């Protein structure tokens, strides 16, 4: 059995983050216009600030189990789980048309938390090349999911907050190929390359871990 680190690339995540940020910023704009500027002259000088989220490569863990049927051949199974987290925030400061009224700024804020999760379950044959190295190939399913949570906080009207959550996912064929190197009689080094999906959902990466023989 081996336990290792997984580092994946999810190129389509950049577009998911961009689209989610744009959607939630538009939602925040509608919220602000409805709550602060629907009454003419109540608030003035709205100023918006904030930052956008950046896509990050998913990272996580890999667990692999190998069972030898004969001295040369066996079966191997693998479970991989990775996650990427990012967020964006937008703030608005307003001034009251009534200069005697004090406003707590930012008047409202919007936070978008974007989570990308990928997991896979694979199995396949293994082949012992010699006493130092074994090769294997696996196939199975890979699931990628992106979730965007929006939370708007209204600092002027305590009951005026708003939140929503949107998610999308894709299940695809996944595959992996790798090798195990015997460091000694009981410890192995395990490295593999894994891929899944296509287009915006294409996910690929490497896993590396240390295994123990029982």
Locate the predicted segments by residue.
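Short glycine/proline- and aromatic-enriched beta-strand/turn motifs that initiate or cap beta-hairpins
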Residues: 1-67
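Hydrophobic, lipid-facing positions within transmembrane beta-strands of outer-membrane proteins
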Residues: 59-63, 117-123, 173-177, 204-208
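Residue-level signature of outer-membrane beta-barrel architecture
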Residues: 7, 67, 125-127, 181, ...
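Repeated loop/turn-to-beta-strand initiation elements of outer-membrane beta-barrel proteins
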Residues: 72-75, 132-135, 181-191
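Solvent-exposed loop/turn segments connecting transmembrane beta-strands
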Residues: 129, 169, 195-207
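Outer-membrane beta-barrel "beta-signal"
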Residues: 7, 181-182, 188, 202-214
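Transmembrane beta-strands of outer-membrane beta-barrel pores
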Residues: 5-11, 59, 79-85, 141-147, ...
